């Protein structure tokens, strides 16, 4: 992973957010938001690619990585206002936001409620409503009772295609290990946020440009979910990558090129 330009912790609201920045602060800002059960290290291929061109910010979502784990359950508006607090802390009036899965749902909420803070939003492998509330509540209960090991043991098949699992075992093992070592309470509390989060009725309020990235083989948030977003967001485009759920890791070059195209267009 590239050497940190700066690493710190922001204490805001009820949470201490771990974050890192890369590149020169006077360049256009690009902030990345991780998926459920991962941390900011999932963006290392994006950091390496973009840090010489943009001011890159990565952070650990509350309850993940080195960020603190406030008492849950969490709500999607908390995940969103954590981002606004971080931008305020860094004195960044406007940025491009890129989030994957849970981070993509956070991005949709931000585009609805804080459009003035973003040039555009990139949402990858996500949906306006991810899964069913009952399933998320059941997963939260399972994790609180048994920890993250059972979830981590099966995560790879939800995250990646069989070919990637076979060809890149070190990457798969690293992400699975990070999940197993994470905070069970933080994971469960974010499951509860996902159980309640549903921005479908508000998508038509989004007026800023949105790039939707979907994985052709994603079993969690499907291409149809991405198409639904584009049908309801006025200034949106869909990019489908040959990947499963964690497309930025499985197809980093294609992912980076898709992000760079909108960065060049709207910055």
UniProtKB/Swiss-Prot annotation:
Concerning InterPro entries, the annotation shows: AB_hydrolase (IPR050471), AB_hydrolase_1 (IPR000073), AB_hydrolase_fold (IPR029058), PcaD/CatD (IPR026968)
**Keywords for this entry?**
Aromatic hydrocarbons catabolism, Hydrolase
Q: Which GO terms describe its molecular function?
A: 3-oxoadipate enol-lactonase activity
Pfam families (UniProt xref) = Abhydrolase_1
To which pathway does this protein belong?
Aromatic compound metabolism; beta-ketoadipate pathway; 3-oxoadipate from 5-oxo-4,5-dihydro-2-furylacetate: step 1/1
Question: What are the BP-aspect GO terms?
Answer: beta-ketoadipate pathway
Is Aminoacyl-tRNA synthetase set as a keyword in this record? Answer: no
Provide the reaction this enzyme catalyses. (4,5-dihydro-5-oxofuran-2-yl)-acetate + H2O = 3-oxoadipate + H(+)
Which parts of the chain span the membrane according to its record? none
Q: What is the protein name stated in its UniProt record?
A: 3-oxoadipate enol-lactonase 2
Organism encoding this protein: Acinetobacter baylyi (strain ATCC 33305 / BD413 / ADP1)
């Amino acid at each position: 992973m590239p050497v940190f330009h700066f690493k710190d912790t922001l204490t805001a609201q009820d949470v201490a957010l771990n974050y890192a920045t890369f590149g020169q602060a006077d360049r256009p800002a690009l902030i990345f938001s991780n998926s459920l059960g991962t941390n900011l290290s999932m963006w290392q291929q994006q950091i390496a690619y973009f840090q010489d061109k943009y001011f890159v910010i990565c952070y650990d979502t509350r309850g993940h990585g080195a960020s603190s784990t406030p008492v849950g359950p969490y709500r999607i508006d908390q995940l969103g206002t954590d981002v606004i607090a971080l931008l305020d802390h860094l004195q960044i009036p406007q940025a491009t936001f890129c989030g994957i899965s849970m981070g993509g749902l956070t991005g949709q909420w931000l585009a609805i409620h804080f459009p003035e803070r973003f040039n555009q939003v990139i949402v990858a492998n996500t949906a306006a409503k991810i899964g069913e509330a009952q399933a998320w509540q059941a997963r939260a209960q399972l994790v609180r009772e048994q920890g993250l090991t059972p979830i981590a043991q099966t995560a790879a098949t939800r995250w990646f295609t069989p070919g990637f699992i076979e060809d890149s075992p070190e990457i798969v093992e690293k992400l699975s290990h990070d999940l197993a070592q994470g905070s069970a309470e933080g994971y469960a509390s974010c499951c509860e946020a996902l159980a309640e989060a549903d921005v479908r009725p508000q998508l038509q309020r989004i007026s800023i440009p949105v790039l939707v990235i979907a994985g052709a083989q994603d079993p969690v948030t499907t291409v149809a979910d991405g198409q639904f977003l584009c049908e309801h967001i006025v200034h949106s485009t869909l990019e489908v990558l040959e990947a499963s759920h964690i497309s930025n890791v499985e197809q980093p070059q294609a992912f980076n090129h898709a992000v760079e195209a909108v960065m060049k267009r709207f910055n």
